Design a protein with these regions (language model features):
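N-terminal capping segments
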Residues: 1-64
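A generic structural signal for solvent-exposed, polar alpha-helical segments
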Residues: 29-31, 120, 137
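...with weaker cross-activation on analogous glycine-rich loops/strands in unrelated enzymes
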Residues: 55-126
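Glycine- and charge-enriched low-complexity intrinsically disordered segments
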Residues: 122-140
Length: 140
């Protein structure tokens, strides 16, 4: 299996696990759970995500990791790349409500994750303007 085929297979497995699930702090349906599952599909052994049931709980867990933001947390585990270098299966961060949102990059500005205009986890095709808001990208 080529590197690209492996990335596509991991991204499809992540999509199958999360697509259609509404965002839910208490049911482990958040972007950090999405990223951790995806990283495992890509062969990374990340620590388990402790249980949290609210945005406040998530903030406390970030502080316990010595970071304030999700991009800072990603910097601890993955090499940062320019958004233009993203391949299928890489991680992207975009501004969100209260937190930055982490998404899995597909192709042609399509990302898997939760979006303010969607009720559940889905593939979001970003406009050029939306894509330009990318706050960070990481090679998985």
């Amino acid at each position: 299996m080529t590197e690209l085929e492996r990335r596509v297979a991991a991204t499809q497995a992540t999509q199958a696990r999360f697509k259609g699930k509404p965002f839910d702090w208490a049911k482990q349906a958040t972007c950090i759970h999405l990223v951790r599952f995806h990283a495992a599909q890509m062969g990374h052994a990340l620590p388990l995500v402790p249980r949290f049931r609210s945005a406040l709980g998530a903030k406390k867990l970030l502080a316990e990791q010595g970071v304030e933001t999700l991009p800072e947390l990603m910097d601890k585990y993955f090499p940062r790349i320019a958004p233009a270098q993203m391949l299928v299966g890489d991680i992207a961060a975009f501004p969100g409500e209260g937190f930055d949102a982490l998404m899995i990059y597909g192709q042609l500005r399509a990302c898997l994750g939760w979006h303010q205009d969607a009720d559940d986890c889905q593939i979001v095709r970003l406009s050029e303007e939306g894509y330009s808001l990318c706050k960070g990208a990481w090679r998985v």
